[in-house]
Amino acid sequence: MSDLSDTRHIPVETLTLDQAAAEHAALVREIAHHRALYYGKDAPEIADSAYDALEHRLAGLEARFPELVTPDSPTQTVGAAPSAGFGKVRHRVPMLSLDNAFTAEDVDGFVEQIARFLNLKEVDGLEFVAEPKIDGLSLSLRYENGALAQAATRGDGAEGEDVTANVRTIREIPDRLPAGAPSVLEVRGEVYMVREEFFALNRRQAEAGEKVFANPRNAAAGSLRQLDPSVTAKRPLCFFAYSWGDLSEPLGATQWEALQRLKALGFRVPAQSRLCRSKAELLDYYAGIGAGRAALPFDIDGVVYKVNRLDLQERLGFRTRTPRWATAHKFPAERAQTLLRAITIQVGRTGALTPVAELEPVTVGGVVVSRATLHNADEIARKDIRVGDTVVVQRAGDVIPQVVEVVTERRPADSAPFVFPDHCPECGSAAVREEDGAVSRCTGGLVCPAQAVERLRHFVSRNAFDIEGLGIERIQLFYDQDRIRSPADIFTLERREAQRLDRLVAMTGFGRKSVENLFRAIDARRRIPLDRFIFALGIRQVGEATAKLLARTYRSVGPWTERMAAAAAERSANPDEAKKPELVGEAYAELCAIEQIGMSVADDICAFFAEPHNRDALDALLKELEAVEDHVPPPRADGSPVAGKTVVFTGTLETMGRSEAKARAEALGAKVAGSVSGKTDYVVVGADAGSKAAKARELGLTILTEQEWLDLISQPGGV
């Protein structure tokens, strides 16, 4: 599903806002997809470490660009919505997730953050409970007056699935608690399956011709979430208790005491848990558990550290979806050796050419791996990876496993270095490598089949042509039926299908009225402003802001296309000139001279116009439009107190939304940026302003409140 190779190799700190926003949107979709598979269908497509890497990258993007954070971002939510097949249970105390630590430095950071929060001068002596992180399905058990009243999965953290009937069939979970138990007790823990029972279950499933499970976690989750409790009753499920939710009385003063109390009430708790009193002891525990991991009867994917004293847990509290007083220290990825059969080239939805290793199937960490990413041409050359090599494969932080090294002593004598293609294997267009970049990219953006659906989705999106009723599902359907293959095809659809409308209705499943409404929506977009037209073409690095700069500079579509074609011709004639645009040509130098564009963006625009397929598609599109409206300079910018100034908005504004604030500023001739730099003139801060305000203070920039900003733009020349 993923095509994040375009920018994932780029450090977050060097991304533009447009790049970050595009990657952020893709990551949100990707993570939502995998959460639905993991929590809703118990059928994950990727390793836990790969999923962790996606969330880690998303968190990094949002830390660098706080304006990208939305309430439904995976960083602000937990798990996935409950399935429609079960009743819903609202958790009285939310079932939150845990932050992850991957290195000793991460653990140091976790402990030091706690010390700073609690204002402790010494971190040694602060007690933690360390316990294995069971790889299973989270479960909450509610007991009322000693009797099991309800059992629910975690779901999205706020609402889970009612699996009470199924849980009553699990022998390790008591139906009644002994005397002295709290009148209300929610026990939280993990449903799991020991490996020996998992293998036996898979043998029985295979003999019966039924589905076999990829790993014990999937087997446990799938067994618990059966609609028929009698199926669950036949599955060897186990349960570890490690926490609690709603309580009528405390279980103890510390995490350790509470675990012992749960054990006394009849629940199994991890025998491998340990009380630790320093960072060194935490890391020793991690190393010991890791070394003995294979000998454990159940799967674990790391260890969990929790502050022992419950009063300190309460003081530390929670972030949006994770407690400050706990973290999960994950184990590194697992490795195996296998044969590299072939190297194939995949073309992603934005044109990135990604090499993929086709492998002799091998089991890595319980999952059969037959393909692995090779990232890019540089990685292949650096590691000298060749077809026929024996390679080491790792399940790590990528969407598919990766090849980490070559076993050169087993290399065939007749092997040859891999030659990376210079043309797209999908459409034959030139594949161009960006200056100072690692990714080769197909330049046939408007015609390449591998990019077509994503390009068309972008073309009709809200800030481009904004064609109502032509969403991703319809685009995919029309593309699969060979009805829409290029932007121009959208505007010829009615002409081509009008005489066979009934057939179109029958083949698409749309109602006649729906199709007629779509035709009207398409016709309504035959006129479009120049900046939206430029943005709609999906040229790499040309986001909304850059499209507006181009529209302001060239004013009309004719001059713009002519000058871009001229710049592309100049660049093609001078491909090696890397530092002086004026030596390339007049049109190219003019393009590079536009503020905030430069050679990198100019080269991507030139690559687009240098490809004949794109020019043909562009000509065909222009023939179908009534007009691409000339750019009209913003009114009353002359004399405006903010004309020519660079403005950054941060935090929540009270009197207007971010889009309105941006539009008003631009109408006054200001440039609205997404990040703070030394070139920023004004930083307007609303409620809950974050890192941008802090950076503005560090740089000594002018910081305005919302009211001060409104007062400023209300001066003569304002709107």
Swiss-Prot record:
<dbReference type="InterPro" id="IPR010994">
    <property type="entry name" value="RuvA_2-like"/>
</dbReference>
<comment type="similarity">
    <text>Belongs to the NAD-dependent DNA ligase family. LigA subfamily.</text>
</comment>
<dbReference type="InterPro" id="IPR033136">
    <property type="entry name" value="DNA_ligase_CS"/>
</dbReference>
<keyword id="KW-0436">Ligase</keyword>
<protein>
    <recommendedName>
        <fullName>DNA ligase</fullName>
        <ecNumber>6.5.1.2</ecNumber>
    </recommendedName>
</protein>
<keyword id="KW-0235">DNA replication</keyword>
<dbReference type="Pfam" id="PF01653">
    <property type="entry name" value="DNA_ligase_aden"/>
</dbReference>
<dbReference type="InterPro" id="IPR013840">
    <property type="entry name" value="DNAligase_N"/>
</dbReference>
<dbReference type="InterPro" id="IPR041663">
    <property type="entry name" value="DisA/LigA_HHH"/>
</dbReference>
<feature type="binding site">
    <location>
        <begin position="97"/>
        <end position="98"/>
    </location>
    <ligand>
        <name>NAD(+)</name>
    </ligand>
</feature>
<dbReference type="Pfam" id="PF03119">
    <property type="entry name" value="DNA_ligase_ZBD"/>
</dbReference>
<feature type="binding site">
    <location>
        <position position="424"/>
    </location>
    <ligand>
        <name>Zn(2+)</name>
    </ligand>
</feature>
<dbReference type="InterPro" id="IPR004149">
    <property type="entry name" value="Znf_DNAligase_C4"/>
</dbReference>
<dbReference type="InterPro" id="IPR001679">
    <property type="entry name" value="DNA_ligase"/>
</dbReference>
<dbReference type="InterPro" id="IPR004150">
    <property type="entry name" value="NAD_DNA_ligase_OB"/>
</dbReference>
<dbReference type="GO" id="GO:0006260">
    <property type="term" value="P:DNA replication"/>
</dbReference>
<keyword id="KW-0479">Metal-binding</keyword>
<dbReference type="InterPro" id="IPR012340">
    <property type="entry name" value="NA-bd_OB-fold"/>
</dbReference>
<feature type="binding site">
    <location>
        <begin position="48"/>
        <end position="52"/>
    </location>
    <ligand>
        <name>NAD(+)</name>
    </ligand>
</feature>
<dbReference type="Pfam" id="PF12826">
    <property type="entry name" value="HHH_2"/>
</dbReference>
<keyword id="KW-0234">DNA repair</keyword>
<feature type="binding site">
    <location>
        <position position="131"/>
    </location>
    <ligand>
        <name>NAD(+)</name>
    </ligand>
</feature>
<keyword id="KW-0460">Magnesium</keyword>
<feature type="binding site">
    <location>
        <position position="190"/>
    </location>
    <ligand>
        <name>NAD(+)</name>
    </ligand>
</feature>
<feature type="binding site">
    <location>
        <position position="154"/>
    </location>
    <ligand>
        <name>NAD(+)</name>
    </ligand>
</feature>
<feature type="active site" description="N6-AMP-lysine intermediate">
    <location>
        <position position="133"/>
    </location>
</feature>
<feature type="binding site">
    <location>
        <position position="427"/>
    </location>
    <ligand>
        <name>Zn(2+)</name>
    </ligand>
</feature>
<dbReference type="Pfam" id="PF00533">
    <property type="entry name" value="BRCT"/>
</dbReference>
<feature type="binding site">
    <location>
        <position position="442"/>
    </location>
    <ligand>
        <name>Zn(2+)</name>
    </ligand>
</feature>
<dbReference type="InterPro" id="IPR018239">
    <property type="entry name" value="DNA_ligase_AS"/>
</dbReference>
<dbReference type="InterPro" id="IPR013839">
    <property type="entry name" value="DNAligase_adenylation"/>
</dbReference>
<feature type="binding site">
    <location>
        <position position="448"/>
    </location>
    <ligand>
        <name>Zn(2+)</name>
    </ligand>
</feature>
<feature type="binding site">
    <location>
        <position position="330"/>
    </location>
    <ligand>
        <name>NAD(+)</name>
    </ligand>
</feature>
<dbReference type="InterPro" id="IPR036420">
    <property type="entry name" value="BRCT_dom_sf"/>
</dbReference>
<dbReference type="GO" id="GO:0003911">
    <property type="term" value="F:DNA ligase (NAD+) activity"/>
</dbReference>
<dbReference type="GO" id="GO:0046872">
    <property type="term" value="F:metal ion binding"/>
</dbReference>
<comment type="function">
    <text>DNA ligase that catalyzes the formation of phosphodiester linkages between 5'-phosphoryl and 3'-hydroxyl groups in double-stranded DNA using NAD as a coenzyme and as the energy source for the reaction. It is essential for DNA replication and repair of damaged DNA.</text>
</comment>
<keyword id="KW-0520">NAD</keyword>
<dbReference type="Pfam" id="PF03120">
    <property type="entry name" value="DNA_ligase_OB"/>
</dbReference>
<dbReference type="GO" id="GO:0005829">
    <property type="term" value="C:cytosol"/>
</dbReference>
<keyword id="KW-0464">Manganese</keyword>
<dbReference type="GO" id="GO:0006281">
    <property type="term" value="P:DNA repair"/>
</dbReference>
